[in-house]
């Protein structure tokens, strides 16, 4: 009898195991099975073992249905309505409302209801008939899940090989010359830095992946359709495990699970392999750049012009809006978010980009308030330290909600950072360090420390009468001797200065350079105003003496090239008011007009006798616009 009982229990266990395996292959399900057990001595009893219903989860894409009941893929569905994209946000309980907005079970065709959770826009629905749970996905989400998969190292190699060969530094320099006048040293530094950035991206790729990419490029292999399918299956499987509360990493809650890449990264040499290796591959490190110079000297224009001629993503970020983590303002991660946006949210491409940090001097720390938190100064510098050196930054994903916390990991190791700032008063700090008098008499010897004290001293010196040319030459001479300790005294922390090894001082603009800026480069100031007047069929003539007078006025204002536009707007205000819809065909500006001794000269078209109807504002005669009251002139 014991053998019979053992045999019976073994058969029951086998049936139970077979049923469990079958259920596991079909998904997590519930049901009832008959298990024979031993009752009283010598009798065989059969009891019904009930299991608590387990939730069954499935994942199905939502297809759009037309009015005639035909799905997007062309298959008819009879009277059953397909799941629409907008229906995942509405309640699907009951039969009221439009039939197209109701969710139906893919297995039995019965109506599904939404699962109430703390998230208002839940995607979980439940079939009341077969008690199955489903995750509603649209076609866009299905495609997005494939794109979400992290690209492998081979993809980065292919991206590097798909790009055009890097332009030589001389070609970049000549391109910058067309838009930026002067600053030859800064243009050389930026041209060489960009060229070396291209070479560093190529060199830091492992040799085996580089050879593989070259072979694939030459043989032009077939598309990665099988790989995409495999990634899709893997993503769906891990997604279902998360929903069911089973994590591949052993986490019972299944809260955070990093997506696994399709290919493994090449293993680096570790431990004894490094000791036994006769040679190591050279890994090129980046050299971040710091541009410093007076306002209006062309720092931002250099960055904007450089961004047009590059094949790598380029982002210009304003440091004045950055704050320390946890405070109101833009987070430091927004710097990489702008670069990722310029790369069209391609992570591998963004990791090879260039970031231009403008107005970096505005985040200098202010001495004397160490007992308080400098959230817009020293706190931002501390947050930028690892970003400049190279770290993995979690950037919020495109169109992601803060509640979900979806982020994209971006490695900043190969991202080149170029910082720029005016650093007003830095020349006075250098002069004090060198124990030199600054432009003669009256220089205080007990200057305070920090950027505020330096800027205040520089502003006080501007109020006095001094030779503008001598002032410019003295500042340029002192800025050429800038050292790291001068920047530290200005308010930059030593760790931040050490991560910007290349310091490039920009010289101030003299009168000759300002005259060239007015006329020579592409998109110059004078051609812009000539184009404005040409739209009203009028010419603008500015004499050489007038150009020199405008340059001298800009030098006196000490605002660099930005002062040129302010002066031109003031000079041409009356002509721009008089010319539209008039018989003025030419405006002449000479030296006396710039000095304010007379008004601009006008050349008018010869008047012709016409009827009153021809003086309409929309009528043009002989190519010249005419006003309604032109006869009075």
Curated annotation (Swiss-Prot):
Q: Which residues carry this modification: N6-acetyllysine?
A: 437
Which residues are in the ClpX-type ZB domain? 93-146
The record's section on InterPro entries has: AAA+_ATPase, ATP-dep_Clp_protease_ClpX, ATPase_AAA_core, Clp_ATPase_C, Clp_protease_ATP-bd_su_ClpX, P-loop_NTPase, Znf_CppX_C4
UniProt binding sites for Zn(2+)? 105, 108, 127, 130
Q: Which UniProt keywords apply?
A: Acetylation, ATP-binding, Chaperone, Hydrolase, Metal-binding, Mitochondrion, Mitochondrion nucleoid, Nucleotide-binding, Phosphoprotein, Transit peptide, Zinc
Annotated GO biological process: ATP metabolic process; proteolysis; proteolysis involved in protein catabolic process
* Designated name of the protein: ATP-dependent clpX-like chaperone, mitochondrial
Species of provenance: Rattus norvegicus
């Amino acid at each position: 009898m014991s053998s019979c009982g053992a045999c019976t229990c073994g058969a029951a266990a086998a049936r139970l195991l077979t049923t469990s395996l079958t259920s596991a292959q079909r998904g997590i399900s519930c049901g009832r099975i008959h298990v024979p057990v031993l009752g009283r001595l010598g009798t065989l009893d059969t009891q019904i073992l009930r299991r608590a219903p387990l939730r069954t989860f499935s994942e199905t894409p939502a297809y759009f249905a037309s009015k005639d009941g035909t799905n997007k893929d062309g298959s008819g569905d009879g009277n059953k309505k397909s799941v629409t994209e907008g229906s995942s946000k509405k309640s699907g309980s009951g039969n009221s409302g439009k039939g197209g907005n109701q969710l139906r079970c893919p297995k039995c065709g019965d109506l599904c209801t939404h699962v109430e959770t703390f998230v208002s826009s839940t995607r979980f629905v439940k079939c009341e008939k077969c008690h199955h749970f489903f995750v509603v996905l649209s076609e866009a989400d299905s495609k997005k899940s494939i794109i979400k998969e992290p690209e492998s190292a081979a993809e980065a190699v292919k991206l590097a090989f798909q790009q055009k060969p890097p332009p030589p530094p001389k070609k970049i320099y000549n391109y910058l010359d067309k838009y930026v006048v002067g600053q030859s040293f800064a243009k050389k530094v930026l041209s060489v830095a960009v060229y070396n950035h291209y070479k560093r991206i190529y060199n830091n790729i492992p040799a085996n992946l580089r050879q593989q990419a070259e072979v694939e490029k030459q043989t032009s292999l077939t598309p990665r359709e099988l790989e995409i399918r495999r990634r899709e299956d893997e993503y769906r499987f891990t997604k279902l495990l998360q929903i069911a509360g089973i994590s591949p990493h052993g986490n019972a809650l299944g809260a955070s699970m990093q997506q696994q890449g399709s290919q493994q990264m090449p293993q680096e040499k570790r431990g004894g392999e490094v000791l036994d290796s006769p040679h190591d591959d050279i890994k090129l490190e980046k050299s971040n750049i710091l541009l410093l110079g007076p306002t209006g000297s062309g720092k931002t224009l250099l960055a904007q012009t450089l961004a047009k001629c590059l094949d790598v993503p380029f982002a210009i970020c304003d440091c004045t809006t950055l704050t320390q983590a946890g405070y109101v303002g833009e987070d430091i991660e927004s710097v990489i978010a702008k670069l990722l946006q310029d790369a069209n949210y391609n992570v591998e491409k963004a990791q090879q980009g260039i970031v231009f940090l403008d107005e970096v001097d505005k985040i200098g720390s202010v001495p004397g308030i160490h007992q308080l938190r400098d959230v817009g100064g020293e706190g931002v510098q501390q947050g930028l330290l690892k970003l400049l050196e190279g770290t993995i930054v979690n950037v919020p994903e495109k169109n992601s909600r803060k509640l979900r916390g979806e982020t994209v990991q971006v490695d900043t190791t190969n991202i080149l950072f170029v910082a720029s700032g005016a650093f007003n008063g830095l020349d006075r700090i250098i002069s004090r360090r060198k124990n030199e008098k600054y432009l003669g008499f009256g220089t205080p010897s007990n200057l305070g420390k920090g950027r505020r004290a330096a800027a205040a001293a520089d502003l006080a010196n501007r109020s006095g009468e001094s030779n503008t040319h001598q002032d410019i030459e003295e500042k340029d001479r002192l800025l050429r001797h800038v050292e790291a300790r001068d920047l530290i005294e200005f308010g930059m922390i030593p760790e931040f200065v050490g991560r910007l090894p290349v310091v490039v001082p920009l010289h101030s603009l003299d009168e000759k350079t300002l005259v060239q800026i007015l006329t020579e480069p592409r998109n110059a100031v004078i051609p812009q105003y000539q184009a404005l007047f040409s739209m009203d069929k009028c010419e603008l003539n500015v004499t050489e003496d007038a150009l020199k007078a405008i340059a001298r006025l800009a030098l006196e204002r000490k605002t660099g090239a930005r002062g040129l536009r302010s002066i031109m707007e003031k000079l041409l205000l009356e002509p721009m008011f008089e010319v539209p819809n008039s018989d003025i065909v030419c405006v002449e500006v000479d030296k006396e007009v710039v000095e304010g001794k007379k008004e601009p000269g006008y050349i008018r078209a010869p008047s012709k006798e016409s009827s009153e109807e021809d003086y309409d504002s929309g009528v043009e005669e002989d190519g010249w616009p005419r006003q309604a009251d032109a006869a009075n002139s």
